[in-house]
């Protein structure tokens, strides 16, 4: 019983409200539906949610404890890319969903310091998205774009 209580109290509490709102996507969505804006802030270490994602990529950066965006996928997507555009600032991404244990993390995209995640098998459900920076408390305006392939 003590082990169960310890596990429950050690698990980070993830909020169901997002700093910049919720957006829903279905197949063949138009680019405007998959484009949202926000800004980074906070000194919450994203590695507190998970040190590594499902592909063993490091989860790094600092953000607000609440997710920045909640994305609801109304259908399964075989392939998607989620890209941050902060005009070249050093950003990171952490996406949790559709369950509590599926984590995807992203950092630099090619020569760009902005983060992206390109992955397969996005299941129908709710995804919590954090956009972070390497420096705690850094405020960077960004556009987040979701593209289906």
Residue ranges and their predicted role:
Residues 63, 67-78, 118-123:
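Extracellular and analogous surface-interaction loops
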């Amino acid at each position: 019983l003590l082990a169960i209580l310890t596990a429950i109290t050690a698990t980070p509490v993830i909020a169901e409200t997002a700093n910049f709102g919720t957006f829903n996507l279905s197949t063949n969505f138009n680019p405007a539906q998959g484009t949202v804006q926000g800004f980074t802030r906070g000194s919450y270490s994203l590695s507190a949610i998970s040190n590594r994602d499902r592909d063993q990529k490091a989860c790094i950066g600092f953000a607000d404890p609440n997710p920045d965006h909640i994305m609801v996928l109304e259908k399964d997507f075989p392939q998607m890319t989620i890209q941050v555009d902060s005009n070249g600032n050093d950003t990171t991404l952490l996406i949790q969903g559709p369950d509590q244990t599926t984590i995807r993390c992203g950092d630099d995209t090619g020569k760009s310091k902005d983060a992206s995640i390109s992955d397969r098998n996005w299941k129908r459900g709710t995804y919590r998205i954090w956009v972070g920076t390497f420096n705690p408390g850094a405020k960077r305006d960004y556009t987040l774009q979701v593209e289906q392939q």
